[in-house]
Amino acid sequence: MKFVLLFGVLLVTLFSYSSAEMLDDFDQADEEELLSLIEKEEARAKECTPRFYDCSHDRHSCCRSELFKDVCTCFYPEGGDNEVCTCQQPKHLKYMEKAADKAKKFGGKIKKWFG
């Protein structure tokens, strides 16, 4: 019985040691992958397409406004056969940004009155 108990403890110890080493290997790989993704995102962030500019080359490259990212909207101009794509802000998001800005200003006034 003592032999079985000793063997079980040894087996659990070896298993936990090997699992810890495997996790360390995965952590190192994850860190390297995360760093490369961050570098790519930083490079991509510098290359965003401003509002009302052509985004047909990359429809996910529109810049962010204060709160929301602009959307690449495509349409056919009147009397034209070519599709035109530009980065635009949807109206509902524009109104939400205006409301958030007014709420910030109102919050500042309340702080000034009571603060």
Swiss-Prot record:
* Keyword Disulfide bond among UniProt keywords: yes
**How far does the signal peptide extend, from start to end residue?**
1-20
Positions of disulphide bridges: 48-63, 55-72, 62-87, 74-85
Q: Where in the cell is it found?
A: Secreted
GO CC annotations on file: extracellular region
**Superkingdom to which the source organism belongs:** Eukaryota
Principal subcellular localization:
secreted
Query: Propeptide positions, renumbered to this chain?
Result: 21-44
InterPro entries recorded:
Spider_toxin_CSTX_knottin, Spider_toxin_CSTX_Knottin_CS
Task: Identify the Pfam families for this entry.
Answer: Toxin_35
Q: Extract the PROSITE patterns matched here.
A: SPIDER_CSTX
Q: What is known of its domains?
A: The presence of a 'disulfide through disulfide knot' structurally defines this protein as a knottin.
Protein's UniProt name: U3-lycotoxin-Ls1a
